[in-house]
């Protein structure tokens, strides 16, 4: 694995919930807080780092913009709202139907090639495996071999 200084761009996949959503709203809860704080910690530790966070848009309308820069971190933290029209307002239990669309959109909408892809929850992990093949990059946490 590269040293922290060698890592310039991290992609964070959180398909089922927006890490920056208000806890208690929708599916937002402890995992959201954990992911958001992890992203902030990475940015604090490495002042050269750029992080792109990808989440599925689950609101009734398309987002006003496909991505936004974070007000605190500027261009170092870009939040992507992946819009798959058929997935709008989908329940968490239905999201597996949209994995391929989400994974493909994460690759096509990215602003930078990632050095590392970090995924949370099995849905995001599956999307990260697909993106790993497209980007030729490692995922973190690393996949565990079958039978291990």
What is the role of each PLM region?
Residues 1-6, 128-139:
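Short amphipathic alpha-helices and their capping/turn segments at secondary-structure boundaries
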Residues 49, 75, 137-138:
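A structural micro-motif
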Residues 11, 132-148:
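Active-site proximal beta-strand in glycosyltransferases
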Residues 16-22, 84-88, 148:
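A short, flexible beta-alpha/helix-coil linker loop
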Residues 73-126, 130:
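Conserved nucleotide-sugar donor-binding subdomain of glycosyltransferases
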Residues 1-69:
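N-terminal subdomain of nucleotide-sugar transferases
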């Amino acid at each position: 694995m590269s040293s922290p200084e060698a890592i310039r761009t991290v992609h964070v996949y959180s398909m089922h919930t927006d890490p920056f959503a208000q806890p208690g709203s929708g599916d937002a809860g402890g995992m959201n807080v954990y992911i958001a704080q992890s992203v902030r910690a990475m940015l604090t530790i490495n002042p050269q780092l750029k992080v792109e966070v990808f989440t599925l848009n689950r609101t009734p309308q398309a987002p006003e913009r496909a991505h936004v820069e974070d007000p605190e971190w500027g261009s170092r933290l870009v939040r992507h709202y992946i819009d798959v029209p058929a997935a709008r307002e989908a329940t968490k239990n239905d999201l597996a139907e949209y994995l391929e669309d989400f994974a493909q959109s994460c690759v096509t909408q990215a602003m930078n090639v990632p050095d590392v892809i970090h995924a949370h929850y099995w849905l995001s992990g599956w999307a990260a495996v697909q993106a790993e093949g497209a980007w030729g990059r490692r995922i973190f946490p690393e996949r565990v071999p079958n039978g291990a």
